[in-house]
């Protein structure tokens, strides 16, 4: 969702759809999302993103989350569900803090079926 929020070429309908979510007072970020977004942001966009993120609480990634993410990844793998490491971390941080994950990425629904992840999968506006 954050990539779409900051990407200049995102269709206006999608930006309108996610704006209420990213401007909520109870929103939080996790460190893997910050890493994922800033690692691929164009140099001219980074300061805008960092200023926006500076206003949002960031959920830390305790060392135990890495082990829990590994276990979740193994559970997914055993169920035939292949999930990238960063998405496993994002899901596990959300479970650790009891935070709901709001996303367009449908593979988080598969993770939710195999874990305690509370995921809201938004249909992408057209």
Segments predicted by a language model, with ranges:
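General small-molecule cofactor/ligand-binding pocket signal
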Residues: 28, 59, 120
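A beta-strand edge to alpha-helix "cap/lid" segment located at domain peripheries
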Residues: 79, 110-113
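Short, C-terminally biased terminal segments at protein or domain edges
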Residues: 118-126
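Active-site neighborhoods of divalent-metal-dependent phosphate/nucleic-acid chemistry enzymes
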Residues: 5, 16, 57-106
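Hydrophobic beta-strand scaffold residues
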Residues: 101, 116-119
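A secondary-structure boundary/capping signal
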Residues: 30-33, 104
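A generic structural signal for short hydrophobic patches within well-formed alpha-helices
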Residues: 2, 34-37, 108-109
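Short, well-structured N-terminal submotif of metal-dependent ribonuclease cores
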Residues: 1-29, 38-51, 125-126
